[in-house]
A protein has these predicted regions:
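Charged, compositionally biased N-terminal leader segments and the immediate start
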Residues: 1-29
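Amphipathic alpha-helical segments within well-ordered protein domains
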Residues: 12, 45-46, 64
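Conserved alpha/beta enzyme-core scaffolds, especially Rossmann-like or related mixed alpha/beta domains
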Residues: 23-31, 79-82, 117, 121-127
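Short, charge-patterned binding micro-sites
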Residues: 27-43, 76-87
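Short, small/acidic-rich helices and loops at N termini and domain boundaries
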Residues: 36, 41-60
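N-terminal catalytic cores of NTP/NDP-binding nucleotidyl/phosphoryl-transfer enzymes
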Residues: 47-51, 97-140
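Short, well-structured alpha-helical segments that form the helix of a local strand-helix-strand
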Residues: 60-69
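Structured, non-catalytic alpha/beta "coupling" segments that mediate domain-domain communication
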Residues: 68-105
Length: 140
């Protein structure tokens, strides 16, 4: 299972255990701009707090505590930052596992797929005005 899927599933499970209703339809995971903020970050506590009638920071803290008690695969640290962002730190074992998968798949097997094979595509270049903002009308 992908580490992102593992984290997402764990977050949704903990939110359900905490009684957050309605559960978010998606859990957005992003790579933080600052490496000190972990390997992955989510704003799910901020997004869910209003509907749950809770303070985002407190919800994030509860989420982090529950996730630390039973961490998802490869997660070694969970912390709350700012108004309720939840940051995840991954173990080096995650990178080792991914690299082992890449080596095992070989040159011809890793990140290759047949999507779009045999399909013709037309590539157009828009004539955008360099002095103004780019918008949908430039694609005509």
């Amino acid at each position: 299972m992908d580490v992102r899927d593992s984290i997402t599933d764990a977050v949704r499970s903990v939110l359900a255990d905490l009684g957050v209703d309605p559960l978010p339809t998606t859990v957005q995971l992003e790579r933080p701009g600052n490496p000190d903020h972990g390997d992955w970050s989510t704003n799910v506590a901020l997004a869910s707090a209003k509907a749950a009638g809770r303070n985002p920071r407190e919800l994030g803290t509860q989420l982090a505590e529950c996730l630390l008690a039973a961490p998802p695969a490869h997660v070694v640290g969970v912390e709350v930052a700012g108004p309720g962002f939840v940051n995840f730190h991954l173990a080096d074992s995650w990178l080792h596992e991914v690299l082992a998968d890449v080596v095992a798949a070989g040159v011809d097997g890793w990140a290759r797929h047949d999507d779009g094979v045999g399909t013709r595509v037309i590539v157009e270049f828009g004539s955008a005005n360099p002095t103004g903002p780019l918008h949908a009308g430039h694609g005509r």
